[in-house]
Amino acid sequence: YICQNCGFSRPKLDYCLSDLTSITNTSANFVIDDANYQINVGGLYNIYNALAAVSVAEFFDIAPAVIEKGFQQSHAVFGRQETFKVGDKTCTLVLIKNPVGANQVLDMMKLAPYPFTLVTLLNANYADGIDTSWIWDADFELINALKVEHIITGGVRHSEMARRVRVSGFDENKISDSETLSDVLDLIEQQASDHVYILATYTAMLEMRDLLATRHYVNGEMK
């Protein structure tokens, strides 16, 4: 940006992503300051995170090869595109907690090349935020452009989440509203699609992970 009157303009960048080579729902390749990098998590928002990490590393004179090695040794962690198997289903668990974050995750799922079941878990505890009206500001209408075969809603505010996805225009005959997370997990196991995305608010994510650990789908550690 630049003002034609006073000359006020965007300052020269110290660190810059100059090329986005490829991006998928599980990885991205890009160029920062003439160095090639790859991260093993999906979505544009994680490239912003990577740019921040590279900027700090370069400030401390860490070589690009060392930075790239660090990226390759990192992996999706606790609730941040964490993947695990539920029976024969490949599940990805992603934390959502506000409209901007939810929209970024929906954009990331748009990159999935395969059909999937979408699970949305909405709680309203203090750690989640007791006001859940933010789901109406999130662009859940995007689900109609995704390869979603079925939606399962759960959590304390499961019925509100079900209403939100119905209002989005998604086929209500393909929405299952579940009162318990145990029922949600049972429904996941019954789905025809091989892939499942689970979007959960914070305490719903913790409760789901506890249930998954009880059934030995994940360990109980926050890695």
Predicted regions and their residues:
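A short glycine/serine-rich beta->alpha loop
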Residues: N36-L44, T90-T92
